[in-house]
């Protein structure tokens, strides 16, 4: 189908065909298509936003969105529709309409962002951004931008919370004029909130996508320079206002979305396990850990004061530990961080559950890193447990292994593990006043969290603990390892 024939074939599409076009698309495709078709006009965007929200509340959403669009733009709807279908990659629909995908691809260039024939170029780039962001990244963007929009404007907030449909939130911000497309050449556009968030969260490619779209569509050289300067000013302004950015290499967690602080507090131990699990048991009964409740209460006090949702559990068996960690990870999509404390007995690279089953610490770390909900978010695993080297007869026959895998080194980014002691040694705990490590950690957060980032706080803890001496000259040195990419600050305390 040559270019001229393609245009002739466009005119053969009938409005009655649109009923079947909608039936062939899933809801996600409808959202993307309607965003591209309706988003460039304020009243149209307002209309389609309400229609899409109504569809999200229906189990069997039926609609005539495309027929409405065709009637509103009788002269141009076919060209807009086919280009938008190309952009969202709706090949099945286009084949049913009689088009050849390769010819459409050469004509409309859907794979090249910022270049369009009929659809607004910024809408195409915004759609591309939505497709490129992970679910977690979309969740962080909507949380950040929605907070800023609501702080600047009156009116009812959008009562929709699914980041899988980020285009719905973009339509809301367009109708509120918090972001602006400008004219067909993107003159008068304003994507300050989006570009600033993308840059401050390491999403430079997506930030450049929006900036380049504005610059490349400016009709005159002077206009291009003006657009570039406007984008630069928007980025600088947004970085100054960003709730999570204190400097280029710093992340400041917020009280409102600090996250979950999960405490597994093991005081009493038993050996009532199935025959299959006996190989994971400690060779000898484990002693009661007096003083651990002091640590638990102190952690609850300190982390609650920073806005964390503290969840503390006593005497949890191995499967209970896994279930509680998984639950916390599942609920961390729109939270800034996750902190997990395990207070127990242990030995080198292992920690005990309350049923005396030994668990591999690196498996627990991998479990935290395996969740998309925590991708590029601070994850803290803090363990108070001995890490002594044991002779073979003092070890379990096997360590219980968690069924978890990570497939990329990137999943381990922003992970911090803080151990009460270096490998090979005991972790000291007073039966009345609690452990040296947890006590020093809470003291350091009390004194320094307003001015020091987490890594520096733990350096202070290591220094203070290493100076302590027990009644028999015992000593201890904590061990911290981290893949944080920037300085991370705890939320402000009350």
Curated annotation (Swiss-Prot):
UniProt PTM comment: Polyubiquitinated by Diap2 following activation of the immune deficiency (Imd) pathway.
One Gene Ontology term from the biological process aspect of the record: execution phase of apoptosis
GO CC terms: cytoplasm; cytosol
Tissue: Constitutively expressed in fat bodies of larvae and adults.
GO molecular function, one term: cysteine-type endopeptidase activator activity involved in apoptotic process
Any Pfam family: Dredd_2nd
InterPro entries on file: Caspase-like_dom_sf, Dredd_2nd, Dredd_N, Pept_C14_caspase, Pept_C14_p10, Pept_C14_p20, Pept_C14A
Entry keyword annotation includes Cell wall biogenesis/degradation: no
EC numbers, comma separated: 3.4.22.61
Similarity annotation: Belongs to the peptidase C14A family.
Subunit architecture: Heterotetramer that consists of two anti-parallel arranged heterodimers, each one formed by a 15 kDa (caspase-8 subunit p15) and a 10 kDa (caspase-8 subunit p10) subunit. Interacts (via N-terminus) with Diap2; likely to bind Diap2 simultaneously with Fadd to form a trimeric complex. Interacts with Dark (via N-terminus).
Protein name per the record: Caspase-8
Species of provenance: Drosophila melanogaster (Fruit fly)
Source species taxonomy: Eukaryota, Metazoa, Ecdysozoa, Arthropoda, Hexapoda
